Amino acid sequence: MNEKQKKTQKLRARLPRGFVDRSAADIRAVDEMIAKIREVYERYGFDPVETPLFEYTDALGKFLPDSDRPNEGVFSLTDDDDQWLSLRYDLTAPLARHVAENFNEIQLPYRTYRAGYVFRNEKPGPGRFRQFMQFDADTVGAAGVQADAEMCMMMADTMEALGIARGDYVIRVNNRKVLDGVLEAIGLGGVEQTNTRLTVLRAIDKLDKFGPEGVRLLLGEGRKDESGDFTKGAGLNEEQIGKILFFVGITDYARSADELAALVAGTARGAEGVNELNTIRGLVLSAGYEADRIKIDPSVVRGLEYYTGPVFEAELQFAVTNEKGEKVVFGSVGGGGRYDGLVSRFMGQPVPATGFSIGVSRLMTALKNLGKLGAEQVTAPVVVCVMDRDIESMGRYQRFVQDLRHAGIRAEMYQGNKKNFGDQLKYADRRGSPIAVIQGGDERASGVVQIKDLIEGKRLSGEIEDNVAWREARVAQVSVPEGELVAKVRQILAEQAEDRKRAG
């Protein structure tokens, strides 16, 4: 490559795979949603905390939820001391490190929330990103299931604060201990059965995807998919498979509770789990949360390898159209559970903890589908046009802008290079500006400004076909003294807002 080629070669602009640029509308929508979620968390007595994007990799370690890649899935680098650092995979492991490192200063139970980006070094795909936002709430140091019940109630209140109606969401609750009891009852207890239990957990995790019959195959000899690929099963017999499918198939806990209790009666862990579910059910019912809002549902299997007790999931139940044009239930927008082992691994002593995480990006999509987000349009700035470029004129334009800003009105002075007035109005139109402020030499000599209602002008433009007549009519344009600029702009903006309200 010669010197001339080097000089003319351009760097290719490209977005990394699995990442997205966020528009102003998306940023404002997320801010609106987070403010509503934060208000609920604060009402429950939770306080904010913030941890860094990077953690030492061993602080994340084998507790990464992606069980197939326990020591991968993260973006990592080494620092000057040859210590491995990784971008956080979730917000829970950093919280565990924070609690352990500051244990003597923290008041237990420690009730905290935080929002932030997390990063996954995984293959990206449709709806699967390498960077996304989560909003978590956790209670550390509370061993009783009342803390888990409170999490479920807070999730329900959060859904409603976001405008999701009852019937369009449900908080589903299960307990890892109950499943452990079921597995022990069918002969899958003990260290020697660890791998089989993991295979069973992964099989029932596919319940929503493959249905009961698909899970039956995965619990048995195995399943062949449409492409012909075969997944080896857990190798259970029909009796074992039947009891697992009974457990995950319970839809009415009140009617099936006795039968489930009998199934795990011989296992201490299973009986403890059933008792915890009954306690959670009693607490939420006493607080006025019926089963249409918080439901005991043994088919919830999220993170059962990760959690140690109750698990819960926030599911949206309305239908949406997927990329194949099919009507499907929107599904999960967040969840969590009890993770008593996560802080303890730093401490060498038991530290109970429970919490949940909301997938902000996914929930934002749901709220947009419901028309619950972004309804409050942000008014684009008023544009003060630049008719003359001498210092005195520019100073006046700048003063107009500052007067509007000090009155709480978004405003900008045209900063482009084009001197043509028509180009400035085109800029304002493309910007979505509601008003243009104009002052040429004649207006300046008279101490007045022209205020052009761009919204009304656009509406009326279709009613005047002749361009000459349009210019002469000065449609939607009014002249006012400089001192009345702010008041007139405010009046026009209020009228535009009223028009939008009537039209909406």
Curated annotation (Swiss-Prot):
It is an enzyme of class 6 (ligase). Keywords: Aminoacyl-tRNA synthetase, ATP-binding, Cytoplasm, Ligase, Nucleotide-binding, Protein biosynthesis. InterPro entries: aa-tRNA-synth_II, aa-tRNA-synth_II/BPL/LPL, Anticodon-bd, Anticodon-bd_dom_sf, His-tRNA-ligase, HisRS-like_core, HisRS/HisZ, HisRS_anticodon. SUPFAM superfamilies: Class II aaRS ABD-related, Class II aaRS and biotin synthetases. GO terms for biological process: histidyl-tRNA aminoacylation. The keyword Lyase does not apply. It comes from the Bacteria. Gene3D superfamilies: Anticodon-binding domain (3.40.50.800), Bira Bifunctional Protein, Domain 2 (3.30.930.10). It is found in: Cytoplasm. GO terms for cellular component: cytoplasm. The keyword Translocase does not apply. It holds the Pfam family tRNA-synt_His. PROSITE patterns: AA_TRNA_LIGASE_II. Homodimer. Belongs to the class-II aminoacyl-tRNA synthetase family. This is Histidine--tRNA ligase. It comes from Rhizobium meliloti (strain 1021) (Ensifer meliloti).
